[in-house]
């Protein structure tokens, strides 16, 4: 009898698996379920089993030896069945029988131990046998065990299934089955079960509605088959039932379940595959059960499930069968509802399966519910952040309130759908980077269509700061910005006050400017405009210094290095500077460069020792650093960086100057090179030339980049020198202290205004270092602009005739040359005495060049420079700078940068995009609300300084941003929408204005 049973098992269940014989599958289902459940049913089941003398290995060997399916089942090999289930097939390789369905393979292998074999043998004897089919012997012996009522009910159901098998075989022979198209959800079912035809469903329903028998069978499976705790421990390390070949029980689920074996059944499948272990995992997690579901309408949860439980396995175990999620949507609800209530399993499974088959895009409904345009509109983004971790509240959480309305589409969704959409929202938020204060910053999310709460203003595009990650602006910059805003008022207000006195008690014209233009102001403005335009015609069109460096990118860091010493040509005569060393010895350049270089080499000694006649041998001398600038015939500029020091030896001796000539204007970089030169010169003069050779062979550094120079130093080995080029073209480490100690704030601002209008300025000082530092500091103040004209920080007395040039210049003279200067016929020039802080000669309008409000704000910041330079919390002037403190150079630099931001910071808005970028000049000027500022721009825009600045921005293809660009961007972000950089009514009608300007 057992042989016959094994034969039937192999022919119906295994070999006919690829075919679309539903009856064969259903007939084999009780055998597989019993084989799966008995080994784990507990000690009581094992105690009832009695040992059998028959060896199961022989039966299995005989069963696996079959090569072809029995001839008694011709219907199972028809072509109709092969077309009906193309994804199911049978493979025989040696002793291995494999069945593949949708990427899942259930392999039948040899049993490896005798205990498992005996258990399977005992279980086989307990199973009731169906009626014989096609001459198969009847299995009626049960080895001394009486049939229980549940077994009788099980057998009666099995008989009804066999009748359906015969009906299906008959239909297959007639060719009326197996050719129907599959519904979308069928191919994703776990065990590749075919769908029931419409004519089969009523008959199956009649068999399932057996009344007492069906209810008793459900009660038996729900109550009796509950594994003990020791068996549940054995299940923890087992593989998923979808992957392995052995019939392990499904993994215990969590709430929500991590996708164990399916719990719904196809119509007519019966209640024979209720998966064991439905309720014991619930007790381990101590989680509240999911709500029960009413049968016919789509499942509606009575209360939302807790969102704190994610559907993923957080214990680190892999989720089983992640590739077959599409047909599992309704398993969770059905399985969880079975724990709390005895529902009609057939009605629930039919309902879930019908919904699965009726929706073509079930998975899209889960991930992308169409009820929300913005997935963040229900997410609370503020008030929930702790440190750098954000605690987000979702609509389904117990703390959130959901209106109890049946019209909401979100409530019509099942709990699984809502949980998946919430989990997707959480995943989207997790992928966003958190800002420094811990708040999420979804940069590219679309704003809500109808903002109705203060939270929705996070997506308001009018405020540019809200939609992006907040930048940390230094406190010093914030304080400087506040001073400017307090002085000039708001952008749309043209007057600070209509009264004669302001809030501070000062006269109105001190802090604000009246719009009434007097004849004197108009006349002065017209005269300045004429002078600037006339100088623009006379002066050569110099390009900006940054553009000069473009063709120099592939050259060396410097052009040549020289040493200048003082010598006497004859006794009793004055000392004369002479060139004593030169590197490289030969200038391998073009003829034009060599001719120009020779002229410069002749002039360099005069710049290194402009005070040569005043020198005498000294015993001690502190080294000093200064620089000069050589301007070529074509306007090209070369910088000379000098270090004057006393050579080694004893007794009185004369100093010498080490000079580096380069086209790169970076004082800090070459100052570091000169430090290394001085260190090696103290050891031996022979060590200087190898160092300069290494520096010349180094690549030319790009903006903001660092190059490394290696050089051998006796006693220390190979030293590594890092040379960094600043990101901005302005001079770094400028000594503003010398400038402020020599000039008052009012005089300094007047000189600054004269340089902006490209006037001629001469500095007078008695020390070479003071003269050089003040000239460099003044040039650094006009950043981001570059001084385009003649610039000689220290002018030798032999070249004093240059001050008679009609072109703009900034020249420094030693006080010893002042008598010669008075004898020369000077034109309009500003002569500044740095020794006594006074103007020796001026044009009388220097104080009225700049816009009044901005000038007052600038002077106010410069007056409080020491307070701003100290710690922001306050402290003495000699306080130790902390992490929040700023140096004097930072305060001064930020003050003048903010001044230019107020004037021209809106230029990016008027740069046309395209291959040839150009500035819309008239629109740029008229966009300013202040009339005085517009008048200043009218003159300033005609200078070569402004033209070079705009040409550099027009030609710049890369987005390299210096300090000015960063501050200008921050300034534009603070403006309300529709008012960029002082843009008032003009930008609102920019289109009409541009048409008018085009016609003009």
Swiss-Prot record:
The uDENN domain, residue ranges: 559-708
GO cellular component, one term: cytosol
Domain of life according to the entry: Eukaryota
Transmembrane segments: none
Sequence ranges assigned to domain dDENN in this UniProt record: 865-960
Pfam families per the UniProt record, alphabetical: dDENN, DENN, uDENN
GO BP annotations listed: protein transport; retrograde transport, endosome to Golgi
Biased composition (Pro residues): 249-258, 288-307
PROSITE patterns: DENN (PS50211)
Localization, UniProt: Cytoplasm, Cytoskeleton
Keywords, comma-separated and alphabetical: Cytoplasm, Cytoskeleton, Guanine-nucleotide releasing factor, Phosphoprotein, Protein transport, Transport
Region (Disordered): 1-155, 174-328, 427-464, 491-525
Biased composition (Basic and acidic residues): 56-70, 79-117, 140-155, 221-237, 427-436
Domain cDENN, chain residue ranges per copy: 730-863
Positions of modified residues (Phosphoserine): 544
Ranges of biased composition (kind: Polar residues): 34-43, 496-506
Molecular function, one GO term: guanyl-nucleotide exchange factor activity
Described function: Guanine nucleotide exchange factor (GEF) which may activate RAB9A and RAB9B. Promotes the exchange of GDP to GTP, converting inactive GDP-bound Rab proteins into their active GTP-bound form. May play a role in late endosomes back to trans-Golgi network/TGN transport.
Protein's name in the database: DENN domain-containing protein 2A
Species this chain originates from: Mus musculus (Mouse)
């Amino acid at each position: 009898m057992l042989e016959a049973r094994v034969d039937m098992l192999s022919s119906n269940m295994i070999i006919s698996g690829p075919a679309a014989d539903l009856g064969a599958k259903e007939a084999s289902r009780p055998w597989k379920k019993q084989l799966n459940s008995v080994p784990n049913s507990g000690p009581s089941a094992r105690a009832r089993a009695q040992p059998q003398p028959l060896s199961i290995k022989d039966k299995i060997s005989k069963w696996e030896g079959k090569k072809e399916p029995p001839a008694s089942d011709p219907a199972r090999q028809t072509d109709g069945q092969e077309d009906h289930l193309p994804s199911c097939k049978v493979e025989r390789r040696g002793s291995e029988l494999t069945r593949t369905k949708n990427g899942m393979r259930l392999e039948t292998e040899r049993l490896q131990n005798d205990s498992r074999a005996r258990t399977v043998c005992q279980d086989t004897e307990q199973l009731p046998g169906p009626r014989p089919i096609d001459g198969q012997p009847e299995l009626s012996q049960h080895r001394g065990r009486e049939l229980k009522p549940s077994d009788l009910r099980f057998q009666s159901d099995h008989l009804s299934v066999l009748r359906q098998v015969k009906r299906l075989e008959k239909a297959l022979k007639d060719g009326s089955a197996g050719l129907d198209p599959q519904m979308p959800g069928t191919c994703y079912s776990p065990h590749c079960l075919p769908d029931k035809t419409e004519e089969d469903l009523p008959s199956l329903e009649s068999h399932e509605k057996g009344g007492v028998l069906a209810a008793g069978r459900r009660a038996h499976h729900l109550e009796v088959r509950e594994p003990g705790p020791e068996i549940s421990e054995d299940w923890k390390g087992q593989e998923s039932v979808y992957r392995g070949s052995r019939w392990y029980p499904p993994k215990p689920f969590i709430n929500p379940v991590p996708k164990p074996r399916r719990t719904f059944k196809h119509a007519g499948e019966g209640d024979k595959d209720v998966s064991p272990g439905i309720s014991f995992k619930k007790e381990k997690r101590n989680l509240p059960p999911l709500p029960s579901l009413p049968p016919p309408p789509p499942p509606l949860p009575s209360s939302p499930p807790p969102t704190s439980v994610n559907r993923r396995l957080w214990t680190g175990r892999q989720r089983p069968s992640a590739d077959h999620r599409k047909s599992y949507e309704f398993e969770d609800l059905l399985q969880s509802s079975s724990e709390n209530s005895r529902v009609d399993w057939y009605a629930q499974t039919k309902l879930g399966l019908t919904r699965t088959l009726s929706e073509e895009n079930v998975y899209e409904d889960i991930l992308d519910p169409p009820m929300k345009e913005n997935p963040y509109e229900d997410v609370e983004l503020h008030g929930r952040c702790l440190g750098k971790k954000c605690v987000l509240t979702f609509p389904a959480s117990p703390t959130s309130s959901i209106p109890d309305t049946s019209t909401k589409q979100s409530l019509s969704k099942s709990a699984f759908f809502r949980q998946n959409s919430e989990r997707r929202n959480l995943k989207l938020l997790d992928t966003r980077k958190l800002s420094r204060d811990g708040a999420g910053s979804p940069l590219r999310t679309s704003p809500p269509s109808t903002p109705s709460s203060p939270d929705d203003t996070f997506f308001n595009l009018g405020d540019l700061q809200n939609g992006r990650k907040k930048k940390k602006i230094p406190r010093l910059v914030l304080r400087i910005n506040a001073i400017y805003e307090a002085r000039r008022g708001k952008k749309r207000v043209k007057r600070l006050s209509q009264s004669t006195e302001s809030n501070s008690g000062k006269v109105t014209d001190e802090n604000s400017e009246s719009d009434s233009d007097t004849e004197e102001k108009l006349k002065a403005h017209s005269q300045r405009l004429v002078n600037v335009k006339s100088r623009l015609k006379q002066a050569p069109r110099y390009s900006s210094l940054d553009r000069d460096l473009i063709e120099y990118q592939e050259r060396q860091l410097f052009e040549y290095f020289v040493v200048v010493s003082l010598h006497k040509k004859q006794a009793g005569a004055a000392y004369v500077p002479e060139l004593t060393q030169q590197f490289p010895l030969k200038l391998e350049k073009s003829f034009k460069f060599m001719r120009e270089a020779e002229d410069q080499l002749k002039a360099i000694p005069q710049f290194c020792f402009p005070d040569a006649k005043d020198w005498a041998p000294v015993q001690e001398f502190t080294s000093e650093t200064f620089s000069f600038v050589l301007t070529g015939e074509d306007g090209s500029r070369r910088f000379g960086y000098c270090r004057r020091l006393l050579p080694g030896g004893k007794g009185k001796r004369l100093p010498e100057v080490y000079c580096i000539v380069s086209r790169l204007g970076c004082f800090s970089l070459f100052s570091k090179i000169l430090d290394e030169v001085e260190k090696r010169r103290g050891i031996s003069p022979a060590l200087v030339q190898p160092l300069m050779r290494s520096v010349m062979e180094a690549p030319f550094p790009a903006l903001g980049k660092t190059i490394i120079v290696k050089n051998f130093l006796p006693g220390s080995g190979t030293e590594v020198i890092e040379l960094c080029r600043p990101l901005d073209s302005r001079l770094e480490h400028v000594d503003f202290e010398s400038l402020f100690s020599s000039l008052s704030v009012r005089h300094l601002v007047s000189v600054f205004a004269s340089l902006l209008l490209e006037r001629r300025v001469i500095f007078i000082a008695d020390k070479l270092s003071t003269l050089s530092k003040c000239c460099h500091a003044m040039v650094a103040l006009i950043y981001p602009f570059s001084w385009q004209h003649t610039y000689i920080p220290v002018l030798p007395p032999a070249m004093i005739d240059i001050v008679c040039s009609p072109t703009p210049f900034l020249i420094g003279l030693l006080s010893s040359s002042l008598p010669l200067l008075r004898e020369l016929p000077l034109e309009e020039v500003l002569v500044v005495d740095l020794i006594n802080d006074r103007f020796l000669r001026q044009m009388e309008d220097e104080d009225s060049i700049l816009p009044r409000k901005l000038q007052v704000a600038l002077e106010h910041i410069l007056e409080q420079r020491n307070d701003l330079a100290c710690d922001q919390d306050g402290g003495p002037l000699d306080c130790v700078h902390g992490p929040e403190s700023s140096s004097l150079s930072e305060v001064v630099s930020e003050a003048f940068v903010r001044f230019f931001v107020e004037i021209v910071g809106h230029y990016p808005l008027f740069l046309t995009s395209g291959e040839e970028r150009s500035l819309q000049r008239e629109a740029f000027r008229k966009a300013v609300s202040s009339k005085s500022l517009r008048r200043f721009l009218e003159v300033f825009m005609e200078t070569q300084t402004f033209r070079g600045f705009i040409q550099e921005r027009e030609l710049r293809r890369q987005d390299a941003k210096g300090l000015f660009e960063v501050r200008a961007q921050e300034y534009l972000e603070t403006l309300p929408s529709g008012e960029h950089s002082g843009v008032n009514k003009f930008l609102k009608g920019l289109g009409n204005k541009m048409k008018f300007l085009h016609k003009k």
